[in-house]
From Swiss-Prot:
Keywords from the named record: Hydrolase, Metal-binding, Zinc
Reactions this protein catalyses: a D-aminoacyl-tRNA + H2O = a tRNA + a D-alpha-amino acid + H(+); glycyl-tRNA(Ala) + H2O = tRNA(Ala) + glycine + H(+)
Protein name: D-aminoacyl-tRNA deacylase
An annotated GO BP: D-amino acid catabolic process
Keyword Flavoprotein: no
Family named by the database record: Belongs to the DtdA deacylase family.
Organism: Caldivirga maquilingensis (strain ATCC 700844 / DSM 13496 / JCM 10307 / IC-167)
Keyword Cytoplasm set for record: no
EC number: 3.1.1.96
Domain of life: Archaea
Cofactor, free-text remark: Binds 2 Zn(2+) ions per subunit.
A family per Pfam: tRNA_deacylase
Length: 269
């Protein structure tokens, strides 16, 4: 698997993780913005991470199989947090980059196994917790993508221990790709969950890997359901509907669409 790293110079967490990773992997500078090594390529941009649209063309030209965006995380009620997610916009709102109504390709196995590995190690990072987020924000990339993030204030973004923690996870992925890819688990999509998943115990217990997650604040449509299922590296077999979060119409539609697409439906009540 050919992996590409996307770094933003204006993102304190991003450039910090990148600096730590360069201490673990011998990268050669190709030009001002590009680096290569035996384990990965890297693109370093002056843009904020959600607006690095050139990552799409760069990944295509370099035949990249998986992109990892190294990023900061922000939230309304800040707390120390390590988080992972797929980028994309379910609606036409592109305030945070990307394209209207388009999502990147999710890599359920890598996304979920990075989370599992971080969850296993999080005791090393005093005061932090770890989670998976719903699919949100840009940029749009027509390649498998995982965002790896440090949250949620400049104190954490600049925290060398948090930067080293994520750099070590990325280093483990680069050196042990098979561990993250060949786990033999079914993939799932999630409809109607909170922005920060409530499926942690099911995921940690290995019941399934999770790709795209459509949060409760997005009203699902047949188009959204189809994108959530089809924009994955592996075909999901499980569709999880968070029953109480959806109105009656959305429940019926989501169950019907997931079933028609061949998924086994789990209703979380």
């Amino acid at each position: 698997m050919k992996i590409g790293l996307i770094v933003s110079r204006v993102d304190e967490a991003s450039i910090g993780i990148w600096s730590m990773l360069k201490g673990m992997v011998k990268f050669k500078e190709i030009n001002t913005n590009e680096y290569s090594s035996d384990l990965a390529l890297a693109l370093v941009s002056d843009k904020d991470i959600v607006y690095v649209d050139e990552a799409d063309e760069w990944a295509r030209v370099n035949d990249i199989d998986l992109l990892l965006f190294l990023s900061r995380h922000e939230m309304k009620n800040p707390k120390p947090l390590i988080t992972f997610h797929t980028p994309g916009n379910w609606t036409n709102d592109v305030e945070l980059g990307g394209k209207p109504g388009q999502v990147a390709i999710s890599e359920p196995r890598v996304l979920t196994n990075l989370f599992r590995e971080a969850y296993r190690r999080i005791g090393e990072l005093n005061g932090y917790s770890v989670t998976l987020e719903a699919t949100h924000h840009g940029p749009f990339v027509d390649k498998p993508v995982v965002f790896v993030e440090i949250g949620s204030t400049s104190n954490e973004w600049r925290d060398p221990k948090a930067q080293e923690f994520l750099a070590s996870l990325v280093f483990d992925l680069l050196n042990n790709t098979d561990k993250y890819i060949n786990d033999g688990k079914d993939a799932a999509v999630s409809i109607g969950d909170l922005h920060y998943t409530t499926l942690v115990n099911h995921i940690i217990n290995g019941e399934y890997d999770v790709g795209h997650m459509v949060p409760k604040y997005i009203k699902p449509t047949p188009t959204i359901i189809k994108m959530a299922v089809e924009r994955n590296t592996v075909r999901p077999r499980i569709g999880i509907i968070h029953w109480k979060s959806l109105d009656a119409e959305s429940r019926v539609m989501s169950e019907k669409e997931l079933s028609n697409l061949g998924l086994t439906v789990i209703k979380r009540r």
